[in-house]
Amino acid sequence: MNVFSVDLEDWYQGIEKPFESWEAYPHRLREGLDKLLELLEKHNTSATFFTLGWIGEKYPGLIQELSSAGHEIASHGYSHKKVYDMSPEEFRSEIRRTKMILEDITGVEVTAFRAPFFSITNNSLWALDILKEEGYSIDCSISPVKTWRYGISNTPDEIFTIKENGITEFPVSTFKLLTKTLGIGGAYFRLFPYGFTKNGLIQRENAGKETMFYIHPWEFDPYHPVVDMERKAKFTHYTRLKKTLPFADRLLGEFKFDTVSNVVKQYKERGSVSEYSVEILKA
């Protein structure tokens, strides 16, 4: 089974605009989100929404709407700040605050977390212990694909348990394309032909591996404002946005998806889960 996951954030949060400036930008969250929700309803699919605490405070009715529709509400931190740019104390405060905000809205325990920009890296593995201490049991923050922003290249390509604290890690799912390792979701989904992602999921299914697909609401909104930014980031953010909707429609029609909590539960019920020391991620 595969996971359909959404980082619930607005377009300006995805391009690293300072937290203090967010109110100055046009809010367009529902422009893309409503299109995505129509697809999920059409294909009878439940998703996990990794939600910013700030979004929860601003749109509590939306969060309740998502939860009532059968989607899982998970944490994406509060301010979309990268974990490795925070102190442990600041990180603890953010994930505790966000957990309380989201649970107060839905009445449902928040157990899963994804760091903004997959920013649990070699420099911020301390965050895994804090997640456990703050009541989280699933983390989806580590990417085996190393980029200028994130990644731990020797991350196991499977769901696994962190030996030291019991956290279940569901890393970014990848597939092989010739000599390259690519992620499944986000900019990879738009930049390459749909068949690349489809073949990636088939490749993983044939190997008996679960897949974590990820996307953002602003990727369904090709008309959100274009602003000046670093060249590489601008390319990955804005390129081929009009492909997201038709590609996602095909994906949801050809593969089955569920929430991360349900998929992890099913995975554990089928047999033993690999356990790795956090030291393997530091190697």
Q: How would you label these PLM feature ranges?
A:
Residues 1-112, 117-177, 196-283:
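Catalytic alpha-helical scaffold of carbohydrate-active enzymes acting on polysaccharides/glycoconjugates
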Residues 23, 181-191:
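Surface-exposed cleft-lining segments at the edges of enzyme active sites
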